[in-house]
């Protein structure tokens, strides 16, 4: 059964609006669902019943709190494309500031602690000439994604599966990190979308500073003079 595309979009927008989600995502998710571009959607008049069912299923997932990036499987960070799924924290725009400030230092040997998707490590490897970058994470599943992202962005990053510095043997010019930072008592009050992200990547202990303190305490042994 063929459905008018504008009616379908109105239905999707209504579902999203009822769940306090930006209505503009309706068109973006339709393009994703149909594997086409936003531009081509404007000349498309209708969709099939199969296409409609697939699309509405996606819209309902979004309405239930599934992050947009987990639905599409991608997130832009530092003008690079990163693969993301439920095993990694979704890269945040705020974290680009950390990358930009590190690039200014122009250091060549860099460690990214708690690398997750690898977005920080990979961005540094991409934008600093001849940089030697390593990324550490306790999650093997996260590192699987990080390795895919390094390959996709044509950079070489050495990823290490380690609980903080336990398996780290090198020294570095600079150590960067965006570790878990949310206070334990605040974990229960997170936005619906954020609760879909890995708890290990969010829970920063009682005061939210557990990992910061551990990293700062141990980092001096791994920094070049």
Name every feature range the model reports, one short phrase each.
Residues 96-188, 193:
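Conserved SAM/SAH cofactor-binding pocket of Class I
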Residues 4, 8, 51, 138, ...:
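Soluble or luminal CAZymes and related metallo-dependent hydrolases
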Residues 91, 116, 208:
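Short glycine/threonine-rich catalytic loop with a Thr-x-Gly-x-Asp
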Residues 31-104:
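Conserved AdoMet
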Residues 9, 26-27, 55, 68, ...:
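A general structural signal for well-ordered alpha-helical segments in protein cores
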Residues 16, 150, 219:
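Conserved hydrophobic residues forming the short capping helix/wall of the S-adenosyl-L-methionine
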Residues 140, 191-223:
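Glycine-rich S-adenosyl-L-methionine
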